[in-house]
Regions:
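Conserved glycine-rich cofactor-binding loop
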Residues: 16-17
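Conserved glycine-rich Rossmann-like NAD(P)H-binding loop of the short-chain dehydrogenase/reductase
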Residues: 30-46
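The beta1-alpha1 cofactor-binding region of Rossmann-like NAD(H)/NADP(H)-dependent oxidoreductases
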Residues: 41-42, 69-81, 115
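Rossmann-fold cofactor-recognition segment
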Residues: 55-77
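Active-site Tyr-X3-Lys motif and surrounding loop/helix of classical short-chain dehydrogenase/reductase
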Residues: 81-88, 108-112, 116-123
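Catalytic loop of short-chain dehydrogenase/reductase
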Residues: 102-103, 109-115, 119, 147-190
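C-terminal helical subdomain
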Residues: 191-195, 199-200, 211-257
């Protein structure tokens, strides 16, 4: 009797649209089963069906397994419940892809941001990221085979272009993501023990957040995340692309932050 090797699992947040959807679809086509997380149940189920149809069209079968989890990532209790549901019902993931996020109000300079707006943006962009990593990554670290990829932003850089102020909650939340990634990567051995932790700047892409006039498509914005999920890694390698983790990537290049 023939047995088939279990397919690797990828968990993707923000999976119902934009960068999260494009990342989820690309990983499915590359052989990953999916755990999809989003707030809107109708949109998420529609996205999951599009992904399943694309998989069937490319592979000629319906072997892809998708699981959907409805979660408002602004609500810590919902995040905890979603983590529990995933960890109790699914195997240890190989990929944890955190592609969700929210923009702050356009006039949200530091001294003009109220408590409600600050907490909303931090809850979604940073607190939920910490919760998801803290709840799911320990098993990945124990398995010594996993990749955590978090969508950050060039607006979260403290050096280089795009650091002139404004959009305070958004910029600061993304700077926090960059710091979390660096800290966790160092704590887990910078890839030497099998766990890679990276942040990406997808650049201005045509999504609900980025708007229809953005220069990049959502597929282009997701490309570096997909590469990070599948790249060969060797901590003794010669190029940044094969040996570095714990950094911020843009177009498959390391950028200072």
């Amino acid at each position: 009797m023939e047995t088939t090797a279990p397919r690797p699992l990828a968990i993707i947040t923000g999976a119902s649209r934009g960068l999260g959807f494009e990342t989820a679809k690309a990983l499915a086509l590359r052989g990953f089963d999916l755990a999809l997380i989003a707030k809107d149940s109708q949109r998420l189920e529609s996205a999951a069906q599009v992904i399943r149809d694309a998989y069937t069209q490319q592979h000629g079968n319906s072997d892809l397994r998708t699981s959907s989890f409805i979660c408002d990532l602004e609500q810590p209790e919902q995040v905890r419940e979603t983590i529990a549901a995933i960890t109790h019902s699914l195997p240890v993931p190989q990929i944890l892809m955190l592609a969700h996020g929210v923009m702050s109000e356009k006039m949200s300079k530091t001294l003009k941001t109220n408590d409600t707006e600050w907490r909303r943006v931090m809850a979604i962009n940073l607190d939920s990221v910490f919760q998801l990593v803290n709840g799911i990554a320990p098993a990945m670290a124990d398995a010594r085979n996993g990749r955590i990829i978090i969508f950050s932003a060039c607006l979260g850089r403290m050096s280089g272009p795009g650091n002139a102020g404004g959009l305070a909650p958004y910029r600061i939340s993304k700077a926090g993501v960059n710091a979390l990634v660096r800290n966790l990567a160092h704590e887990t051995g910078l890839g030497a023990r099998g766990l890679l932790v990276d942040a990406i700047c997808p650049n201005h892409s045509r999504t609900d957040m980025g708007g229809s006039d953005a220069p990049r498509s959502a597929e282009e914005g997701a490309a570096t995340a997909i590469w990070l999920a599948t790249r060969p890694f060797n901590p003794a390698g010669t190029s940044d692309q094969e040996k570095l983790t714990g950094v911020l990537w843009e177009d498959q290049q390391v950028v200072p932050w």
